Every structure is written in C-alpha cells, then in structure tokens.
Amino acid sequence: DILAAFRVTPQPGVPPEEAGXAVAAESSTGTWXTVWTDGLTSLDRYKGRCYKIEPIAGEENQYIAYVAYPLDLFEEGSVTNMFTSIVGNVFGFKALXALRLEDLRIPVAYVKTFQGPXHGIQVERDKLNKYGRPLLGCTIKPKLGLSAKNYGRAVYECLRGGLDFTKDDENVNSQPFMRWRDRFLFCAEAIYKAQAETGEIKGHYLSATAGTCEEMMKRAIFARELGVPIVMHDYLTGGFTANTSLAHYCRDNGLLLHIHRAMHAVIDRQKNHGXXFRVLXKALRMSGGDHIHSGTVVGKLEGERDITLGFVDLLRDDFIEKDRSRGIYFTQDWVSLPGVLPVASGGIHVXHMPALTEIFGDDSVLQFGGGTLGHPWGNRPGAVANRVALEACVQARNEGRDLASEGNEIIREATKWSPELAAACEVWKEIKFEFQAMDTL
C-alpha cells in the first residue's frame, strides 16, 4: 500500500475518527451517498483505510491520521495520478478546518514503475569529472531585464572565475527583452569559452520551462543540439506531466536536469494546511530531476535544520529510516532509483560556506546569486571568492578540522592569500536574515 500521514484539524464537534475516515474515503472510493454501482465492484479491495490516529503534542485539536491506499488505485509511473487521487479533492472538505499531507511512504513495487532522475548523483559527477566537494552555482542577476549578450557575458565571467554552473532565474523563460534562442546561443558561447580557458567542464541551467509541452521540448532539443550539459525546469508551475516527459527526454539524450521549485511555498509554507515539502521532494524524485532547491538553513529562505536535512536525505539516499525528530513519518526504500542533488540557494555568501559544507556535505550544489554578483570588484572576483572559500573549507574538513566551530577562522586564514575573498568578507560581514522558520515540527 501507499501510506499517507495527514495532519488533520477537524471542525468543532467533529470527532477525529470521523475526520480521518472522511479523508480516507474521499481520497479513494467514497462519495457522500451509497450508490447502487457499489455492488458491481469489491469496495473492500479498493477503499482507503485510516488505520491510526494520534494527537499532536502541544497542538489543540490537531491529529496525525495515517491512511493506507491499495496500490491498484494508482496508474503506474504517474505522479500526476498519485496526487490527483491522494490530495485532489479532499482538501476542500467541509468537516475539516485544515488538512496537511505530512509524508508519503511509496512502496517498492510502485517506485519501480518510475524512471526517476534523468541521471543521478554518480553519473553527474562522472559527466562533469568533479569529485570530493560540493558543486558551486550562481543565479544570474538582475533576474529580468538583461539583453542576451550581456547575460552571456555575466555567465562567462562567473564560470571563468571558478564556478561549476550558472543558472537562469526561474522567472526567465522567453520575454521581449531576451528571447530564449538568443539566450541559449550566448550562454553556450560563454560555456565553451570558459571551458577552454579553465580546462574544467562548465554548465548553465538553460530554462526549458514554457507555456506548452511542445515548446518546452523544442527548447530542450535545441539545448542538446548546442551540446550543453544541463537544462532546467520549474516543476510545480510546469506540472508533473511535463516534468516527467522532460526527464525521460533528458535521460535518453544525456542532458542533466536542474529543477526549480517555484510556487512551492504556496503549497508547503503553512504548518497546518497544504502538503509538506518532503512530499513534493519525493514526488520530484519519482518524476525526475537531477538537482532540486531544498532550502539553505542559513540564508534568506525558509528551512529549519532538522526538517531540511530530513528531506535532503530523502532526496539523496537509497534507504531512509523513520525519524519523527526530522519529520520523517515512514521508512522509505528507493531501491535503485537514482538520487537527487539538493541545491542550497537564497541569501547565502562566503561567510556561510563552512556551515553549508558541514550541513550539506559533498553531494550538494551551493548556489550564490547576489553572493557572487554583489562582489565589489565584479562577477569574476565574486566567483573566485566563492571557489577559494569552498576549497579552503573542504581542505580543512579533510584535515580533520571542525567546520562548525572553526569556520570563521578557516575563512579568515584563506583571505590572507585571496584578496577577492577578503573583499567579499568585508562586504557581507554584517548581512543576516534572522527570522524564525514557519514550518517547524
């Protein structure tokens, strides 16, 4: 069975058992009346069952309802159908004040019907020939308004300075100030120039996100013809059907697929209603994507440490044990489904590098937009500063030093032989984003 954990807030006067049973029925075979066609099938075989309800400590009138769905209710290899069934209708239910899908357990039999990420972590490292450290990226800013040629120039400067990737912002598709084909051509030129000068493989996440699936595939095909290593998709705004199609194309044609989670906070930000991001992340691993943004713990966007590391493990690892302290409600076995690299992005800069390296480990992408392009000397020195900071942190960690306690000292030592890093530290030493996370356990 597919198992689901719902956070249920019943309306006043509705017992939790009734609310849990209503969720199970409405998201499987139930309707509001008994119908004569019920007799033409075996409802016992197909109905969802609410098998456990537990109150949430410290919350009034909130419960975790566990529901089991028979596997035959779902089309093979379709995240779209899985979500339509489990969360399609039930969230507007009048008997509930609020409802949140906290976690899903996907059984091995269903996992095996999905291709999953286009390539996965090990294949990506082999393609890029980069091992033993996190990868570095940068979102090109300003996100809107640059011409294609100026955009390509910014890409070149960042890659030349030492970054592995640059990125289209999720808003950049094909607007009047910069059509997609022009952007693809200038970015490809920047990639090849930077590769020739550095001897390293470089990439730029060219966004294939478009208004129709046909247009999306046209952009992905053009990217492949240019010979670039990676494309990008906004998987929630683009939709799971489009995303799965693109992931299949990427595997067949040797393209890596970077996934942006634009719109996720509309769904996952509220603590008592919606769907937790760990559910969206599991769905993405099934639908397909080699990278996905997962919060930073230390930057400007939402993300508490334990919760973030919980879904980072769900993205990367083959087998994840149940661990309620990190928000993981079920043990999940991904069998041979490739892993996804978590991307830390949003309000981070060189002073965060030790913490990021310690929190996320080697299998991650650390993405600095303003933290590269905001360098007082320009884009290339900004990229140099980030690469020097990363190499210093990785070397210190490999020598057995503790990044959590010695991080500032490690960066300070590196500034002695990198004026670019010294300038970056001077600019960002006062920048902090000190707000409480909304989505806590």
Swiss-Prot record:
Its EC number is 4.1.1.39. Substrate binds at residues 89, 139, 143, 261, 293, 345. The record marks 300 as: Transition state stabilizer. The active site is at residues 141, 260. GO terms for cellular component: chloroplast. Signal peptide: none annotated. It is found in: Plastid, Chloroplast. GO terms for biological process: photorespiration; reductive pentose-phosphate cycle. Keywords: Calvin cycle, Carbon dioxide fixation, Chloroplast, Disulfide bond, Lyase, Magnesium, Metal-binding, Monooxygenase, Oxidoreductase, Photorespiration, Photosynthesis, Plastid. The modification N6-carboxylysine is found at residue 167. Its cofactor is Mg(2+). Binds 1 Mg(2+) ion per subunit. It comes from the Eukaryota. CDD domains: RuBisCO_large_I. It catalyses: 2 (2R)-3-phosphoglycerate + 2 H(+) = D-ribulose 1,5-bisphosphate + CO2 + H2O; D-ribulose 1,5-bisphosphate + O2 = 2-phosphoglycolate + (2R)-3-phosphoglycerate + 2 H(+). GO terms for molecular function: magnesium ion binding; monooxygenase activity; ribulose-bisphosphate carboxylase activity. Belongs to the RuBisCO large chain family. Type I subfamily. RuBisCO catalyzes two reactions: the carboxylation of D-ribulose 1,5-bisphosphate, the primary event in carbon dioxide fixation, as well as the oxidative fragmentation of the pentose substrate in the photorespiration process. Both reactions occur simultaneously and in competition at the same active site. The basic functional RuBisCO is composed of a large chain homodimer in a 'head-to-tail' conformation. In form I RuBisCO this homodimer is arranged in a barrel-like tetramer with the small subunits forming a tetrameric 'cap' on each end of the 'barrel'. This is Ribulose bisphosphate carboxylase large chain. It comes from Coriandrum sativum (Coriander). The gene is rbcL.
